[in-house]
């Protein structure tokens, strides 16, 4: 008795599984078939049928039921097909009219767009014409620089504008030489100011400004023969492109260079390892590691 009661659930479950499986299979097969039956097949019109429909459409875009039935009998198609054809034909006609209107507007718009690039080109040409003279002037400035100047590229900007200006560094104001040669040597010495950490020594050299007023003026303590000898030696040293005291325009055998003035007594010792500034009022030392 218990075994009989236990069997029906399994049998029922088995049947339920099979029936549920069949229910799952049948809808997947049966439901898509019904929309296919409801979907209308695409009607293909022949050339003769289209000619008759176009002739009626030329007469009126909205034919009544009687006209549609008459045409349906002629072309051997149901009246509903004729009605749908007229509906689609009217939509196509409206679309063509919109395209024509948009095409007319697009024809006008490109003319405006064509004129605007010409204006842009003219404006670009005008700007290029305005900026072309600075480019041409920058060429001689670079060509006028000497070969040693290319070694000291960071200092090639400020000395070109005015090598003996009061706003330049103390090394440029204090070195005795003519204006033509100062353009090259001031550029070579400008990078050595990096040892000073960007400090301006203009306050220590204020009495020296009046001596560099003329283009060919030199410092009073230095004689012209000494200047020319130092220049000749410094040119040979700069051509060798050696880094040290010789590349900075000093004699290769000399260890220090002293400048003395009556108005302001100060001493400048230039070595490869250290740099000393001495003054009567304040004495300080800056050593480069």
Swiss-Prot record:
Organism listed in the record: Xenopus laevis
GO CC annotations on file: nucleus
Membership in a protein family: Belongs to the paired homeobox family. Bicoid subfamily.
Subcellular location(s) of the protein: Nucleus
Gene Ontology process terms (BP): regulation of transcription by RNA polymerase II
DNA-binding region boundaries: 38-97
Free-text function comment from the UniProt entry: May play a central role in the initial events of axis formation and in particular in specifying anterior head regions and their spatial relationship with trunk structures. Activates the head organizer gene cer1 by acting synergistically with siamois and mix-A/mix.1 through the 5'-TAATCT-3' element of the cer1 promoter. Also binds as a complex with lhx1/lim1 and ldb1 to the gsc promoter to stimulate expression.
Region (Disordered): 93-140
Site label Determines DNA-binding specificity, positions: 87
Gene Ontology molecular functions: DNA-binding transcription factor activity, RNA polymerase II-specific; RNA polymerase II cis-regulatory region sequence-specific DNA binding
Compositionally biased intervals (Low complexity): 95-106
Protein name: Homeobox protein OTX2-B
Keyword terms, alphabetized: Developmental protein, DNA-binding, Homeobox, Nucleus
Domain of life: Eukaryota
Record's compositionally biased regions (Polar residues): 123-140
Keyword flag Nucleus: yes
Matches recorded under CDD domains: homeodomain
Main location as per UniProt: nucleus
């Amino acid at each position: 008795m218990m075994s009989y009661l236990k069997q029906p659930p399994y049998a029922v479950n088995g049947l339920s599984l099979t029936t549920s499986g069949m229910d799952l299979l049948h809808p997947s097969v049966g439901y898509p078939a019904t929309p296919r039956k409801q979907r209308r097949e695409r009607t293909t019109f022949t050339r003769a049928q289209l000619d008759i429909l176009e002739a009626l459409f030329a007469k009126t875009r909205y034919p009544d039921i009687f006209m549609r039935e008459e045409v349906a009998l002629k072309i051997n198609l149901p009246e509903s097909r004729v009605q749908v054809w007229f509906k689609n034909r009217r939509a196509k006609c409206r679309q063509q009219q919109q395209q024509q209107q948009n095409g007319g507007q697009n024809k006008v718009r490109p003319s405006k767009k064509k004129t605007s690039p010409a204006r842009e080109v003219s404006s670009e040409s005008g700007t290029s014409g305005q900026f072309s003279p600075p480019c041409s002037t920058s060429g001689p400035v670079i060509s006028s620089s000497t070969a040693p100047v290319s070694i000291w590229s960071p200092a090639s900007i400020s000395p070109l504008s005015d090598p003996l200006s009061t706003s330049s560094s103390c090394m440029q104001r204090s070195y005795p030489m003519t204006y033509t040669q100062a353009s090259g040597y001031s550029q070579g010495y400008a990078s050595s100011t990096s040892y000073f950490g960007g400090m301006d020594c203009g306050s220590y050299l204020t009495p020296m400004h009046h001596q560099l007023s003329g283009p060919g003026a030199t410092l009073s303590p230095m004689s012209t023969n000494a200047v020319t000898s130092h220049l000749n030696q410094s040119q040979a040293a700069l051509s060798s492109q050696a880094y040290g005291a010789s590349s900075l325009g000093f004699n290769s055998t000399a260890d220090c260079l002293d400048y003395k003035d009556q108005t302001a007594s100060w001493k400048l010792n230039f070595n490869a390892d250290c740099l000393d500034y001495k003054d009567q009022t304040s004495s300080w030392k800056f050593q480069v590691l």
